[in-house]
Amino acid sequence: MSNTTQLRLDASRALSDFRTERLLKKIQKICPEVVTLNSRYIHFVNVDGALSSEEFHTLESILDYGEEAIVTASTERFMAIPRLGTISPWASKATDIVHNCGLKKVLRVERGTCYELILKGNAVLKPEEREAIAAVLHDRKCREPGCESGHRVCRCKRQGHAVDRYRRTRQRSA
């Protein structure tokens, strides 16, 4: 029986300054209390078995690209992830590259985007604002919204490296 694990690796900044400003203005029309928007890519890596330290370092090197992400203590966090049951073109190419670099234990590499909002003072998003902002942050044809509360994320240690284990939990309709 295979030992398949899905790793969650934080990555680079997802949006340019221009795109961040444009998106922030759209979000501020929904909720004027939002003062800052940061974004970063998250890589989800399906692995069959454990990676050696060398394999893990190679994987990190391959997935190290772009500007360093800005990490702050955000008030609200949203995720846009590929639709369940689909394989994005980015995932196909990234998985090919990883395999060509000799990482045969890696079954698939996928990329999502984490958006972090900072609100003024003690402001909190209302449910209708949260829903409207989630709609702005993802393209429903190829991505679906998520948030930290909609995903189970736990810290773990694997071969001396701190990684996040990511499991998608589906919310059931009543």
What are the residue ranges of the model-derived segments?
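Core nucleic-acid recognition elements
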Residues: 1-174
